[in-house]
Amino acid sequence: MHTVVLLVGIVAVVVVVAAACSKLDLPSPLVLIVVGVAGSYLPFVPDVTLEPEVVLFGLLPPLLYAAALQTSLVDFNANRRPILLLSVGLVILTTFGVGAVVHALLPGVGWAAALAIGAVVAPPDAVAATSIGRRIGLPRRVVTILEGESLLNDATALVALNTAIAAFGGVAVGLVFYVVIGFARKHVTETTLDTALGLLTPFAAFVAAEELGVPTSADHVAHPSGVVAVVVAGLLLGHRSPVLQNAQSRIAERLNWRSIQFLLESAVFLLIGLQARDIISNAFSTESSTTRILVLCVATLVSVVVIRMAWVFFSRYALVRPGPDGSGKVPPWTYTFLLGWAGMRGVVTLAAAFIIPPETPYRDVLLLIAFFVTAGTLLLQGASLPWVARRLRVPSPDPAADALLRANVLHQASQTGLARLDELAGDDPHDVAATIRDRVRRRDFAAWERVGPQGAENPSETYNRWRREMIDVERGRVLEVRSTGTVPHEVIDEVLAMLDVEESMLDHSSAERERVRGATAHAFEGDCDHLRQVRPPVEPDSPGECTDCQREGTTWVHLRMCVLCGHIACCDSSPQRHASVHHEHTGHEVMRSAEPGEDWRWCFVDQVTG
């Protein structure tokens, strides 16, 4: 019962603190640590001992799996060089660097224990770095590298701590689980069974890898890495989910793992703080002086920060890869500095510290070092990361540019779908094809409207507002029918679910529109010859209006301008689509946005933006 009360209390504190931080715009990971430290000194809060097995077998597999599912395998592969340099090279360097510092300041600890604590504090934490990084809007490439580093560096550190772990064995186990789970998912159509498979996968992959063993000598057995197995399985299953799962299963898995990830991540930060009292009291009750312990903790923290910063700048030119435009430019030094500064440690550091054998000299001091580095990096680097990003003027992902790319990709998908529809609609007595074409075009129009200016309400916003009002009264009527008891509750539940699905789509569209509001879509290099052509600037023939709409007495939504002749016409979201008509009549390939603050272009021939 004591354990149940403790778990309920942890979840309750997590929910309350997260809700308060959301209202006050505060970083919940840092606040949870402070709350945990304060709670550890309250008399009515029970002692919480963080068992290594709980973290390594209970928390680490689902957290890594959830992160791997959301990590793009394409981006991971494109950034594999910096990821490997950080997750392997930096962890090894930090292990020996911190080990040398600890051994120099505390000679009685011995080289084995000194290197062990070096391996313990070496790996940064995926939860800390990406949760704060995404919240403040770090560049996507920086977040991708941090995610990839954090997925692999735990395995590297645990290899350094337990030299029997074999990374290649972990890869093999992960591949086996990907094949087995992928095969099962292709034949499982029920969402609940698919969800159960997803929940089972990280724990099964981790345990299977850790239980397998290959004898390397008479008294030694090598084990595959459970961490690597979970990461490999998660990356591949996440990458292949559009093929392996149906739509309902993908939506359910996405929502389930987001909820699990939120609860576990938040609980991790609270647990870190709750360790404070016992770790501090045990360390200062040893024979070492208070001054020596404090100097050792501060020196280790400084070493961790300095070694990481020095390594990322030293290897900066090794981080170069061809960018999306194929330029191969060296990343800005500001990106490099952020990578160096975003090296917060987390719960794995504390859990690994508890693996150090009890008979190790100065073990309590080593545990305090691990806690001090974890809390210090989270509070020092985590709290200052938003300020550092602002001072360096590092650009956040542009919502308007994202909306432009989203509209372009959706348009390409729609064109492919309409081509398939033409093949299917040979015999169509009920004119179903026309209905489908109209819905697809309206979906495309809505995507393009989100790129437009944020002034008057556009047709999609009007539709969302009106339809949401309708759904409210429709749901009210369904609830009235339910209260009469004349209709089976299964039927009522199905109708309510249908309304919920439609309303959730409207809410998603509105949230996306709010992210774009106030942003500016900037130009980027297109990938067709028409967009790449340098053209002399032309003056618009009718600034601020579509003369065709004026003549016909119709209303336009957004305006476009032909880059060859300067003709202003309305977009395809407008009723008359005069920009497309202009292209059909003149053969002019490229139009650009004529809205204030926008400089993107559209090629009618190749159907791409630039």
Functional labels for PLM-detected ranges:
Residues 42-43, 247-248, 459-460, 535-542:
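Short, positively charged
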Residues 546-549, 562:
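Short cysteine-rich clusters marking metal-coordination/redox-active sites
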Residues 397-525:
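Cytosolic C-terminal regulatory domains/tails of membrane transporters and channels
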Residues 372-373, 418, 475, 543:
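Residue-level signal for cytosolic alpha-helical hairpin/rod architecture
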Residues 524-545, 552, 567-610:
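Cys/His-rich, Zn2+-coordinating zinc-finger modules
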Residues 259, 551-553:
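Short loop/turn motifs at secondary-structure junctions and domain boundaries
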